[in-house]
Amino acid sequence: MEWETVIGLEIHAQLATRSKIFSGAPTAYGAEPNTQACAIDLGLPGVLPVLNREAVRMAVKFGLAIGAEIAPVSVFARKNYFYPDLPKGYQISQYDLPVVARGKLSINVDGKALTIGITRAHLEEDAGKSLHEDFHGYTGIDLNRAGTPLLEIVSEPDLRSAKEAVAYMKKLHALVRYLEICDGNMQEGSFRCDANVSVRPKGQTKFGTRAEIKNLNSFRFVEKAINHEIARQIEILEGGGEVIQETRLYDSVKDETRSMRSKEEANDYRYFPDPDLLPLEISSGFIEEVKATLPELPDAKRDRFKAQYGLSDYDAEVLTASREMADFYETVVREAAGDPKLCANWVMVELSGLLNKDGLEITASKIDAAGLASLVRRIADATISGKIAKQVLETMWNEGGSADDIIERQGLKQITDTGAIESIIDQIIAANPEQLAQYRAGKDKLFGFFVGQAMKATQGKANPAQLNELLKKKLQ
């Protein structure tokens, strides 16, 4: 039997506010346990939550970016459940009246354009964190994270493979960073995913029984966990068994999912409106105010890069994958005042290679955009060849310094004097009469031999175009 996979993702994006969603406690990552939790976060009596306006602004900004409806009135609800790191015994979230509803996101998978529906995006507070190490068999509770603002983004069940799920998640990750509403740091838990996975016979419209895989915090783990879960469910069904609705956890070491608990339904949480918080009213004026702050979005920037700089689909996609990369590239083009394609190659290939080697993001590059632009200018004006430029780039990366200083100090300028190049060619031809005879007898591949000898003699500094042209004339 042929099976079809149905996937929906719930993505939790930690909003980049300075304080928590219902208190003034800070949200900085990495502080000593329980040093960033106030009475509200601890659930102590006699204190009331106050909604963070900036968190609302960020949620609205996201909604506008995905073409969603912004609710004029939305309601906060208490989601009741017990967990050691949930001090109040409930989580403040949104249920039937979320702030954002009915949006969409376009993705491209293997050249195929897909539109993924986004059911809703709602505001909620994060829970604390259970610490299981260094407590001699006990569990420690760190409530620094309790009350941190989250935007939970729930997709429609429109995804049909792990590959599509990862593409959607990457697109969403780029979007929240473009909007500057989330830093997207997956290692720190700022952007994490729950995946709802089910399978059904191909052609069937009724959904299969789903399992939810919790807290996936890397694109690689999302793909591996979903693929494993698909295989697990198909194996059960083909063996005559029945998939049960449950929550599962992905074990990255064993590359498997394991059961955590039976999957709760909404009524298990006994949602009801939070009596301590008034309904959230969002005016059209506030929406317009937020709309005015929207940056150029990834899809629009990609299309502009193709039109303005003549880039291919692939190049434009790579260079606009992050706002920081796009800004870096445009600065290089502007400072170099040169060929946008040449600039793209040096950003995407040479510089990115060094970044990947050292595990750095573009924001931590040892060579800034102006520095790379100065190197590109020297390639464009034929001061140095592309091969020499790679050596200069390595030196700039490892030792610092400007391209011009390194070129001057190491004597790397191209030899462009026609007389000097002709003299070197004459010496090489005189020293290799046998190869000359073979070339003139029709062995054209020996042309590369003469080029190599000339480059060796000039330590790679001969202008390649001039060298080729003069060499062809001399060898005739």
Curated annotation (Swiss-Prot):
One of its GO terms (biological process) is glutaminyl-tRNAGln biosynthesis via transamidation. Keywords: ATP-binding, Ligase, Nucleotide-binding, Protein biosynthesis. It holds the Pfam family GatB_Yqey. The keyword Nucleotide-binding applies. It is an enzyme of class 6 (ligase). InterPro entries: Asn/Gln-tRNA_amidoTrfase_suB/E, Asn/Gln-tRNA_Trfase_suB/E_cat, Asn/Gln_amidotransferase, Asn/Gln_tRNA_amidoTrase-B-like, GatB, GatB_C_1, GatB_Yqey_C_2, Gln-tRNA_amidoTrfase_suB_CS. Its EC number is 6.3.5.-. NCBIfam families: gatB, PRK05477.1-2, PRK05477.1-4, PRK05477.1-5. Allows the formation of correctly charged Asn-tRNA(Asn) or Gln-tRNA(Gln) through the transamidation of misacylated Asp-tRNA(Asn) or Glu-tRNA(Gln) in organisms which lack either or both of asparaginyl-tRNA or glutaminyl-tRNA synthetases. The reaction takes place in the presence of glutamine and ATP through an activated phospho-Asp-tRNA(Asn) or phospho-Glu-tRNA(Gln). HAMAP family: GatB (MF_00121). Belongs to the GatB/GatE family. GatB subfamily. This is Aspartyl/glutamyl-tRNA(Asn/Gln) amidotransferase subunit B. It comes from Methylococcus capsulatus (strain ATCC 33009 / NCIMB 11132 / Bath).
